[in-house]
Amino acid sequence: MQRAAVVLLLCLSALSAHAGDVMTKKADGTYVVRTTTICKARGYRKGTPVEVHIKKGNVVKVVALKNQETVPYFSRVKQFLLPLYNNLKLSKAKKLTEKTKVDGCTGATFSTKAVQKNIHAAIEYYEKNK
């Protein structure tokens, strides 16, 4: 019986630690949402997690986290796609995640779509948990 209680306690503490890893609030009021555990969208190879920085209802910036995508292709995503979200209102950023074609990312279709899904998941998470 004690063993079951200890296991339950460990599981609960792991879940609460997980929630803190997803969204944090910086001293300046910026929320940082990490999609490592909340979005399973895959690029060409594996997941393409991002950090979405949000302040006062605007996306400040999107930062690509460590992934295993092909470097030359993912570089296009970082160079052309991620800056499109800088300083956008959340509603406009959400609409942009739903676009099927994004200029400038030719050849990086899988990565682009996966990153868009990650950004969408981050915005949704922020809106539900802020």
Language-model features, listed with the residues they occupy:
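Positively charged n-region of N-terminal signal peptides that target proteins for export
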Residues: 1-4
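Hydrophobic h-region of N-terminal signal peptides that target proteins for export
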Residues: 10-18
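Flexible, solvent-exposed loop/hinge segments and secondary-structure transition points
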Residues: 18-130
